């Protein structure tokens, strides 16, 4: 999250090129040439003892001899001198440096040196960066790029060069083009925080191969994606590709889960990547998902329809009003439908008429115009007609329009015209639909993230009991627990298991079966055989003592022959569950090396591969997120939506997944959990067979999670002056209805003091932003009073920290009819304690001069109060920790 030094890197006022040269093949020559050719409006200072001047610019022999401290330095010398030069730059006071090449053995010393001088590093082994709005080309790339609104961040120099070459041909612009290299210091999450606030950037494209800190990435990406679309292409999906890239980037389904959870969109290949660049550069935001297609041929429209159907897209339905208008505007033989086929003899005038009618319609959310090469309607004329229609129609600049001019040579000029006009253009109908669905999926992801979670039925969570059971098992030397041993842990979290008994041998198994009644299931108990069915270690529907005796003896004999080294700890005996009409599922928790615990849902089997047979999500889960996981599993055919007799209880399964998530979040000792099978019968879910892997854990239990969970430890009961008890706790996404009810009981005057303007209505998006917070970046405490009838919010206080965790902006609001009870002071004191404990240096706020209550409270709590009557504000500031 740190933004220290990024301003100097991405908006430098002066640059020093260390190792500048007049030899054309040297890096120092290429860097100087590109910096000067880019039109950088600031001093560029070559540093070299070998030349008096480089490319006409006076050179300086050493870093120490520079006339002033550069904002940015670029190391172009032999990598062996990196540490020596970095030390000199640090002593000079330089705050940012691009390292073009280095060896891994230098990395610790380089990082230590940079940290000592509070210097930020881009690279090593970085291609450099381009910032066209600053006229900055601090890279090896000789390709000039245009100014634009798209930022591109890449972990690959080869991919960077490819995109640059492709963009130059299409005259496509960028706000920033940054090659990270090995990301020794500055990483993708730092840049996401910067670009999220950059006014020149409206969309972001990422090429990633690995992550050093998944939690910081998810946090930064989620924050940035609330305001700007972010697309990701991730290589290294296969083990072979990861080996080639020398990167252990984790399981590919984990990336999908993280990207979706952060509200981003993933593209799968370079073809989609190029389409995505075109889309992000030109397409307007979607207001919905319904697509209208206009074409001069049935075949290309059919190809577009097929792709739309395969990707679960939506076709717009035309109203009678629109149909009548089209009939009047177009020749008699044109069938009025969607797609609208203007026929192969359609002229440019027909295109213009059709588009003008459709621009008056509200029936669709995006318009796709397709043109196939035709003698009757040359591509360039039709393109000009479309551009003219959009230019002169009042709604032309507000409608999302995509163009597909088929062909290559005959359509080149048309595509150039569209690019100049700021319209996205594609070469094939399928590619156009792919691009459209990218934006649809992005919109869906954002919409899902903002939905208000439903409150589940009462959730069971006896964390202390679960911890005690797991710790006892660890103290006993256990690394794996079976169904019998893990059942009390699962029951502590409301997860039902089938009663299970342990039998030492076949005779005891028969005795247990006689006691519990037939039929029974018999299972092998061995920590060395994870999949019992591989050795026929599971026998079902045993109905007599003889069958139990025979099955038990045969099972043990088979294992001794097939797995002579395997430890046998007896047998498990269970009553047979009623499987009639039931569905067998599998829930697995695995630990990913990058993203930590993953929750997987599938139908299972012996050869179970999560990549192919499971839907995956990151904990923590609420009811909405769990429901998305279930629906995703059904949609992608990982599980069936119903059994032979009844539909799957999605709400019930979602609640079970939330319980599993809570267990994993609360108990870091759990390394792996495999519930297989999980029997789903109506609204009942029963774990029939469970394996749990565990290991001792010390340190911060949340550090292993890619997303910070709800901080239960911050809950606190408080007694108000009137004697009422209320709970101070962090805000939850589920609080949205209560927050809206709370705001309704705050007077307009108090709301004006809080928001500095009159607000007639808070939208769902407003409330979602207030309740669905990232606990790593901000904190909001609510005071909640609960009675037998209802639970209500009485007050809210909030602090949002800057990315460097130095300053935080605070606000506090109490229900207007509850003033005088000390609630505002207690809430603000809790917020002060929280921000101080998290290392923040200052807590800042603003209010109005006539808000005497807030000003008085701030003074009592030690805030500095600065009344600025001319501006009509009062600045409040409280020092927390020394910098």
Language-model region placement:
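A short, sequence-level motif marking secondary-structure junctions
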Residues: 543-545, 693, 731-734
């Amino acid at each position: 999250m740190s933004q220290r030094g990024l301003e100097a890197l991405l908006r430098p006022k002066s640059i020093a090129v260390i190792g500048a040269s007049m030899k054309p093949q040297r890096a120092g020559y290429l860097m100087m040439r590109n910096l000067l050719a880019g039109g950088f409006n600031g001093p560029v200072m070559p540093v070299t003892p070998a030349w008096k001047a480089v490319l006409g610019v006076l050179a300086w022999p050493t870093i120490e001899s520079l006339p002033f401290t550069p904002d940015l330095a670029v190391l172009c010398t032999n990598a062996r001198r990196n540490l020596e030069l970095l030390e000199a730059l640090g002593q000079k006071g330089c705050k940012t440096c691009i390292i073009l090449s280095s060896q891994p053995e230098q990395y610790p010393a380089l990082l230590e040196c940079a940290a000592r001088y509070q210097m930020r590093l881009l690279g090593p082994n970085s291609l450099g960066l381009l910032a066209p709005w600053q006229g900055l080309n601090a890279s090896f790339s000789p390709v000039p790029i245009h100014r634009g609104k798209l930022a591109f961040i890449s972990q690959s120099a080869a991919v960077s060069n490819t995109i640059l070459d492709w963009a130059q041909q299409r005259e496509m612009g960028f706000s920033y083009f940054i090659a990270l290299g090995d990301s020794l210091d500055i990483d993708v999450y730092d840049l996401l925080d910067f670009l999220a606030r950059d006014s020149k950037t409206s969309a972001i494209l990422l090429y990633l191969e690995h992550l050093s800190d998944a939690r910081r990435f998810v946090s930064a990406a989620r924050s940035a994606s609330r305001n700007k679309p972010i697309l990701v292409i991730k290589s290294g999906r296969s083990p072979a590709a990861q080996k080639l890239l020398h990167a252990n980037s984790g399981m590919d389904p984990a990336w999908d889960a993280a990207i979706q959870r952060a509200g981003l969109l993933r593209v799968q290949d370079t073809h989609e990547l190029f389409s995505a660049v075109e889309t992000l550069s030109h397409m307007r935001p979607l207001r919905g998902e319904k697509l209208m297609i206009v074409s001069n041929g049935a075949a290309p429209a059919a190809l577009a329809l097929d792709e739309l159907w395969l990707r679960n897209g939506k076709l717009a339905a035309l109203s009678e009003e629109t149909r009548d208008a089209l009939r009047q505007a177009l020749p008699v033989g044109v069938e009025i439908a969607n797609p609208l086929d203007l026929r192969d003899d359609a002229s440019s005038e027909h295109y213009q008429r059709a588009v003008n009618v459709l621009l008056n319609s509200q029936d669709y959310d995006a318009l796709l115009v397709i043109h196939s090469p035709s003698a009757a309607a040359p591509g360039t004329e039709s393109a000009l007609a479309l551009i003219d229609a959009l230019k002169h129609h009042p709604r032309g600049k507000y409608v999302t329009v995509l163009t597909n001019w088929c062909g290559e040579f005959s359509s080149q000029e048309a595509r150039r015209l569209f690019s100049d006009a700021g319209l996205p253009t594609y070469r094939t109908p399928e590619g156009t639909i792919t691009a459209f669905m990218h934006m649809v999926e992005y919109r869906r992801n954002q919409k899902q993230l903002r939905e208000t979670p439903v409150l589940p039925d009462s959730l069971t969570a006896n964390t202390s009991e679960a911890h005690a059971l797991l710790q006892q098992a660890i103290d006993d030397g256990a690394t794996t627990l079976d169904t019998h041993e893990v059942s009390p842990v699962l029951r502590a979290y409301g997860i039902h298991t089938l009663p299970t008994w342990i039998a030492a041998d076949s005779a005891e198994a028969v005795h247990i079966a006689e006691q519990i009644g037939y039929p029974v299931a018999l299972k092998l108990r061995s920590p060395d055989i994870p999949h019992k069915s591989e050795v026929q270690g599971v026998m079902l529907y045993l109905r007599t003592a003889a069958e139990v005796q025979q099955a038990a003896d045969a099972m043990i004999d088979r294992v001794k022959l097939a797995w002579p080294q395997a430890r046998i700890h007896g047998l498990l005996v269970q009553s047979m569950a009623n499987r009639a009409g039931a569905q067998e599922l599998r829930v697995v928790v695995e630990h990913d090396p990058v993203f930590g615990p993953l929750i997987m849902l599938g139908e299972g089997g012996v050869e179970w591969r999560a990549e192919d047979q499971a839907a995956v999500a990151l904990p923590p889960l609420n009811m909405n997120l769990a429901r998305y996981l279930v629906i995703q599993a059904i949609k992608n055919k990982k599980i069936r939506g119903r059994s032979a007799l009844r539909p799957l209880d999605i709400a019930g399964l979602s609640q079970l997944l939330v319980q599993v998530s809570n267990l994993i979040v609360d108990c870091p000792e759990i390394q792996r959990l495999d519930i297989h099978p999980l029997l789903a019968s109506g609204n009942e879910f029963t774990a029939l067979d469970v394996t749990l892997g565990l290991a001792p854990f010390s340190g911060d239990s949340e550090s292993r999670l890619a997303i910070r969970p709800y901080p239960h430890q911050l809950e606190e009961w408080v007694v108000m002056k009137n004697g009422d008890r209320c709970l101070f706790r962090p805000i939850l996404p589920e609080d949205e209805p209560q927050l809206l009810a709370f705001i309704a009981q705050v007077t307009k005057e108090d709301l004006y003091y809080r928001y500095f303007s009159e607000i007639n209505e808070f939208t769902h998006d407003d409330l979602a932003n207030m309740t669905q917070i990232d606990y790593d970046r901000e904190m909001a405490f609510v005071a909640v009073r609960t009675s037998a009838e209802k639970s209500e919010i009485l007050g809210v206080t909030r602090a949002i920290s800057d990315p460097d965790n130095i300053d935080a902006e605070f606000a506090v609001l109490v229900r207007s009819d509850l003033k005088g009870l000390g609630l505002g002071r207690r809430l603000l004191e809790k917020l002060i304690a929280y921000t101080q404990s998290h290392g923040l240096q200052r807590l800042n706020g603003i209010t109005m001069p006539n808000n005497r209550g807030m000003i008085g409270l701030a003074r009592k709590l030690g805030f500095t109060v600065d009344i600025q009557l001319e501006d009509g504000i009062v600045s409040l500031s409280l020092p927390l920790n020394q910098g």
